[in-house]
């Protein structure tokens, strides 16, 4: 795609446009509703950075919405599965959004700023604590927009999810305001990049940016005359950070983090690492027919927060104590199968379906991982399943704990 065409493509992320204009070698790929760099180095180099180093990558496919109005806390709490009112200032929580039948319509992360207290807060929670039992000391200042409540939504579900949420604003003093357009140089527009890997804290210390020792916490700093919002997200195998900033300053921050030792990676490696971590993506591993407990993502559910859309079904499942299938992380022995590949027991009985799969090329040898929806009755009989596609076949085994990836390059 020509540079001029890319610059006017609404799906192109700010980083994609910047790399194109700088003639940095890369390929583009559609990922989560945006055009973003697919590869920026050799696959093994990118995977090693994610697993053992500090990987720098695009998050321009994420979009933000501010929830405004005097009823914002009460209304939002009634629309999502996790706590809103009890969020500690400068923290966030991952949520599912349901319909009245309890089916998942999408997912989002709610972030609360630090400049106001929730008018609905019922059960005070302790301040987040660091790994040593003390309060996490975040350098910088609280982040907050006009309302103090913001949503992060992937581009591929943004329009649908916003339409769903807006349907339920009736007599409420609530407004959902999209905040970013991701166009380079456009006044007020913002974008995001990410840092993932066990050495991310070292990179941040090296360049003088805040390090957070707890997940789902954030702060804001002034850097090069710009406000940069730094959030630590959820990671199973490695810390994951987000940096939100004016898109006009993206090139400088990208280069600055590279001076600290961060290695640029593309979306193909990020996607493979997501699958290895066992973190589901909506529209891929979780779809509209699924119920929350079927996804086994209990970190998205809060059972004492009060009423919300779809709660009756969630509570009914909780009281019954079981669902008939679960999304499970898998390690594969064999070729990487396409999504939709059937999993079977030894006798040929269908046990489930692969929802996503990828190879993780490592210096110590390639590993294959997947996510799959497994029938509960099949899981009760076996933790390993067969699969076949074309002339290829293999075995898929449920991972009870996160995989150990070994050691990286010395």
Summary of predicted features, one role per range:
Residues 57-78, 183-205, 322-332:
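Short glycine-/aliphatic-rich beta-strand segments at the starts of folded cytosolic domains
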Residues 3, 108, 289, 295-301, ...:
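Glycine-rich, small/acidic residue-mixed loop/short-helix segments
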Residues 69, 151, 195-197, 243, ...:
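Residue-level signal for inorganic ion chemistry
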Residues 1-95, 103-105, 113-116, 122, ...:
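Acidic, proline/glycine-enriched N-terminal capping motif
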Residues 71-106, 198-226:
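Internal amphipathic helical hairpin motif
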Residues 242-331:
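Anionic-ligand-binding alpha/beta catalytic cores of soluble enzymes and soluble regulatory domains
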Residues 71-76, 158-162, 201-204, 248-256, ...:
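Short, conserved charged micro-motifs
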Residues 109-118, 140-280:
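Acidic, low-complexity central loop/insert segments
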């Amino acid at each position: 795609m020509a540079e001029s065409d890319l610059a006017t493509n609404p799906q192109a992320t700010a980083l994609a446009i910047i790399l194109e204009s700088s003639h940095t070698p890369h390929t583009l790929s559609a990922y989560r509703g945006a055009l973003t760099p697919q590869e920026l180095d050799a696959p093994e180099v990118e995977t090693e950075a994610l697993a053992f180093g500090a990987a720098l990558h695009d998050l321009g496919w994420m979009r933000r919405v501010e929830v405004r109005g005097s009823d914002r806390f009460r209304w939002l709490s009634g629309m999502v599965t996790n706590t809103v009112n009890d969020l500690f200032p400068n923290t966030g929580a991952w949520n599912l959004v349901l319909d009245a039948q309890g089916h998942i319509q999408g997912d989002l992360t709610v972030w609360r700023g630090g400049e106001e207290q929730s008018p609905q807060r019922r059960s005070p929670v302790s301040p987040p604590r660091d790994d040593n039992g003390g309060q996490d000391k975040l350098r910088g200042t609280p982040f907050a927009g006009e309302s103090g409540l913001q949503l992060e939504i992937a581009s591929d579900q943004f329009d649908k999810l916003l339409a769903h949420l807006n349907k339920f604003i009736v007599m409420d003093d609530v407004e959902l305001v999209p905040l970013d357009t991701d166009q380079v140089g456009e006044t007020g527009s913002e974008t995001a990049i990410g840092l993932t890997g066990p050495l991310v804290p070292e990179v941040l210390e090296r360049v003088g940016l805040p390090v957070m020792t707890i997940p789902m916490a954030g702060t804001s700093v002034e850097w090069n005359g710009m406000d940069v919002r730094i959030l630590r997200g959820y990671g199973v195998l490695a810390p994951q950070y987000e940096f939100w900033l004016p898109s006009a300053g993206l090139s400088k921050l990208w280069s600055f983090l590279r001076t600290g030792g961060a290695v640029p990676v593309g979306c193909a490696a990020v996607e493979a690492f997501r699958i290895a971590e066992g973190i589901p993506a909506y529209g891929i591993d979780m779809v509209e027919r699924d119920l929350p407990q079927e996804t086994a993502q209990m970190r998205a559910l809060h059972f004492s927060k009060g009423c919300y859309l779809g709660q009756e079904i969630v509570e009914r499942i909780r009281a019954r104590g079981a669902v008939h299938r679960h999304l499970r992380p898998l390690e594969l022995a064999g070729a990487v199968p396409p999504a939709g590949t059937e999993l079977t027991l030894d006798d040929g009985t269908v046990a489930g379906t692969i929802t996503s799969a990828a190879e993780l090329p490592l210096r110590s040898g390639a590993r294959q991982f997947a996510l799959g929806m497994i029938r509960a009755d099949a899981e009760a009989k076996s933790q390993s399943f067969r699969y076949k596609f074309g002339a290829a076949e293999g075995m898929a085994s449920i991972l009870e704990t996160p995989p150990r990836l070994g050691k990286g390059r010395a």
